[in-house]
């Protein structure tokens, strides 16, 4: 039977690991969202340029 200190250590390590995983996952989600935003902005800019050039002709 583990002692109270051992249980506390196990709980602390489990909590720390879960917080670390949540932080990594949050960073991943944030970077994916930023990537999609930049892709969308680039596509809109390109569409605007194409519209300008087709309007000139």
Curated annotation (Swiss-Prot):
Membrane-topology descriptor: Single-pass membrane protein
One term under GO cellular component: mitochondrion
Keyword list, A-Z: Membrane, Mitochondrion, Mitochondrion outer membrane, Transmembrane, Transmembrane helix
InterPro entries: COX14
Cytoplasmic topological intervals: 38-57
Known function: Core component of the MITRAC (mitochondrial translation regulation assembly intermediate of cytochrome c oxidase complex) complex, that regulates cytochrome c oxidase assembly. Requires for coordination of the early steps of cytochrome c oxidase assembly with the synthesis of MT-CO1.
Subunit: Along with COA3, core component of the MITRAC (mitochondrial translation regulation assembly intermediate of cytochrome c oxidase complex) complex.
Protein name (Swiss-Prot/TrEMBL): Cytochrome c oxidase assembly protein COX14
